[in-house]
């Protein structure tokens, strides 16, 4: 499956998740990471239409400022958890997990440091790895999942229904 097809499949699955969240009156947020930084493009909201539009227009490819994405995600979730301590926080990260942009110096260490804070905060994390199958594995998604207890899936393993089932199982466990 080519990179564009993999990302389109992931976007389709997330759109299904957005619709499910809307029906349950859950809130969604979106952080995009590309070029040299991550940015909050959708603060937590119930607007599925806005989330769907932003997701469809989201470009793929280029650099992967993964450390900044995890840092920003932690900050956004931390604020939301402080405002609403009874929420069940679920973070879904879709990436090839090949960090290549540092916030300061060591991008891999920065990713692990941010993930440690996320795990300590009790945020449920689902990693969806878009790195193509090959003998040479560069991405660190599986290592992140193993180290911090995050759920990990290759994009090829997932369907829209599978992602919804994963999120529903997290909600039931709390």
UniProtKB/Swiss-Prot annotation:
Signal peptide as annotated in the record: none
Domain of life: Archaea
Family matches, as Pfam families: VWA_2
InterPro entries in the cross-refs: Mg-chelatase_DI-like, VWF_A, vWFA_dom_sf
Protein's UniProt name: Uncharacterized protein MJ0910
Source organism (scientific name): Methanocaldococcus jannaschii (strain ATCC 43067 / DSM 2661 / JAL-1 / JCM 10045 / NBRC 100440)
């Amino acid at each position: 499956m080519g990179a564009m097809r993999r990302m389109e499949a992931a976007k389709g699955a997330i759109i299904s998740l957005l619709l499910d969240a809307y029906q349950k009156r859950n809130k969604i947020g979106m952080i995009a990471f590309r070029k040299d930084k991550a940015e909050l493009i959708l603060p937590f909201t119930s607007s599925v239409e806005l989330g769907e539009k932003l997701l469809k227009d989201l470009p793929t490819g280029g650099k992967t400022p993964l450390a900044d994405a995890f840092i920003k995600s932690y900050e956004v979730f931390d604020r939301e958890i402080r405002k609403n301590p009874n929420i069940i926080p679920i973070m879904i990260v879709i990436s090839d997990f090949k960090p290549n942009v540092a916030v300061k110096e060591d991008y891999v260490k920065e990713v692990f440091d941010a993930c440690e804070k996320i795990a300590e905060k009790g945020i449920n994390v689902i990693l969806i790895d878009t790195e193509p199958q090959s003998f040479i594995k560069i991405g660190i998604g599986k290592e992140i999942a193993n180290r911090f207890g995050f759920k990990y899936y290759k994009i090829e393993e997932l369907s829209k229904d599978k992602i919804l089932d994963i999120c529903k199982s997290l909600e039931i466990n709390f």
